[in-house]
Amino acid sequence: MQVLQYAPLDLVTHLRDKPSTVDKPIMRPWMSDVFDVAYVPDPAIRRDRLVSPAWQANADGLTGIAPALVVTCEFDRLRAEGIRYAEALRTAGALVEHQDVPATDHGYNILGFGTRALTERTYRLIADHVRTAMTG
């Protein structure tokens, strides 16, 4: 079972090229330089479909991949790539659920930008899907 909560799924495209719909998004372009290098130091490897499954055609042909829950945030710069990956998973028959958390940005659950109830609801959703995957 894949659980992807506001995951970086395209490390090829720099964060400055990923739009946000809010004036002051949590994810700033400089963060791409820090996190992308920390995750995968070699830029050439970032093109690998296992590293950037939402980049270009990397999400094509996902048949047989593990089932997935994808959680995106409405204002997150990573939202579009999460949606692209969720759509590819749906095409492959592997999307269990895509939850787009409304009126939230990246890190809402740990930075205090979402309500406690919203965070708890998302965590319950994740726990329920993992429990179902483990117990059938």
Language model features with spans:
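Alpha/beta-hydrolase superfamily serine-hydrolase fold, recognizing
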Residues: 1-136
